[in-house]
A protein has these predicted regions:
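Conserved Radical SAM active-site core
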Residues: 92-214
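Flexible, acidic/Gly-rich N-terminal and inter-domain linker regions that tether
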Residues: 1-105
Length: 215
C-alpha cells in the first residue's frame, strides 16, 4: 500500500491552523480537526461531523487516515495481552502491544522499523535498521488501540516507547509523537504516563532531560 497523501497524524495543530488559512477557512476549523482526531478518535474524514461536507472532502482528498495495515494478531493465554503486527505504507513491519494490568491499559509502541543498536539479546537488533518511523506512524499506533478501548468503555492509561527500535535514535519523531499525544487540547495523556526506554544514548538523554515537557 503506497500513497502520495501525507499521513494526517504527522501534522501538528499549528500546521492545521496554517492550512485552514490557506483554504480560506476560519481558524476554529483547525481546533475541530484536532478534536476530531485526538478526542473523538475519528478514523476517516467522513466521520468529522463537526465540519462542513466540502471541508471533509478536502481532508479526504489531501490526507491519508490509514498508515498501518493489520497483518497478524497474537494473544496471551489469559487474553490480557495483545500483540499486533502492522505493515506500514511501504510494507515495513512493526509491532505494537496492549497490556491490561488491573486498572491500567498500557501500550508498548514502536519507533523504528528494525534497529541499528545491534543488541545481541534482542530480536529486533538482529534485523538491522530499516528506517525511522514518522511521528504520525508512532501516534497512529496509540490511536488505533485507543479506538478499540473506547468501544469497550476504556482508555489508554500509559504508553511505553519500548517496542521495536531505539526511540532516541529517532529523537525528533519520537518527541513530536509524545508532544502530540500529550497535547492538552488533544489526546491529553500526561507526561508521567509515558516511559521512554533507551540503550543509553548519552547526548540524547542529556537533551531529553534538559527540555521542558508538560508534567
Amino acid at each position: 500500500m503506497t500513497t502520495d497523501k501525507p499521513l494526517i497524524y504527522d501534522w501538528d495543530l499549528a500546521q492545521f491552523q496554517a492550512l485552514m488559512a490557506d483554504w480560506g477557512q476560519p481558524s476554529y476549523r483547525a481546533d475541530q480537526i484536532w478534536d476530531g482526531l485526538y478526542q473523538q478518535l475519528w478514523a476517516s474524514a467522513e466521520e468529522f461531523s463537526t465540519l462542513p461536507k466540502g471541508l471533509r472532502a478536502h481532508l479526504d482528498e489531501h490526507f491519508s487516515f490509514v498508515g498501518l495495515r493489520l497483518s497478524k494478531q497474537l494473544y496471551s493465554s489469559d487474553g490480557q495481552t495483545e500483540k499486533r503486527l502492522y505493515l506500514l505504507r511501504d510494507d515495513q513491519a512493526i509491532e505494537t502491544v496492549l497490556m491490561r494490568y488491573d486498572e491500567r491499559r498500557t501500550l508498548c509502541i514502536t519507533t523504528q522499523a528494525g534497529c541499528a543498536m545491534g543488541c545481541t539479546f534482542c530480536a529486533t537488533g538482529q534485523m538491522g535498521f530499516r528506517r525511522n518511523l514518522s511521528s504520525g506512524e508512532i501516534v497512529e499506533q496509540v490511536l488505533v488501540f485507543a479506538r478499540l478501548l473506547a468501544a469497550e468503555g476504556e482508555t489508554v492509561t500509559n504508553v511505553v516507547l519500548m517496542g521495536m527500535g531505539e526511540p532516541f535514535h529517532n529523537y525528533e519523531a519520537s518527541m513530536a509523537a509524545l508532544d502530540r499525544l500529550g497535547h492538552a487540547e488533544g489526546f491529553n495523556l500526561g507526561a508521567r504516563r509515558f516511559t521512554v526506554s533507551t540503550v543509553g544514548l548519552i547526548p540524547a538523554i542529556q537533551r531529553f532531560t534538559s527540555e521542558q515537557r508538560k508534567e
